[in-house]
Amino acid sequence: MIKTGKFVYEPGEHEAEKASNSYLMSLIAVIAGLPFPIVNLIATVIFFIANKKGTYFVRWHCIQALLSQFSLFFMNSFAFWWTIYILFGEKTITNNFMAYLITVFFFNLLEFIATIYTAINTRKGMHIEWLFYGNLTNIFCKA
């Protein structure tokens, strides 16, 4: 799921810290706005906008964090609104609903662990590429 490799250049201490903060921003947003999926995405977008003129290393990791949050946003939003519909509508809890919640929980947990791992290692100046998101980030982020 995660590939560690060399970056185009050796990032400085300040760059590594900013790149690491792009992942920490999403973790802090999870704690602050847990029931609302949009909070996480907005926090990551704001951090990206604040750093879009930053160095290539910082921009690259901001984009990877943003892409991972963007895909989770759709999964979490669907789970959130389905739950609201069950609580306030005339629907009942079904096996499909429970299976979807378990799947969403699993993907959120996996992303949470990967984010912590990436934040720690990016802070050390290592370049971490996530499966799928790393390739997309390479397409979106130009040197």
Can you say where each PLM-predicted feature lies in the sequence?
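Membrane-interface extramembranous regions at the lipid-water interface
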Residues: 1-33, 39-66, 119-143
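Hydrophobic alpha-helical transmembrane segments in multi-pass membrane proteins
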Residues: 18-41, 64-115
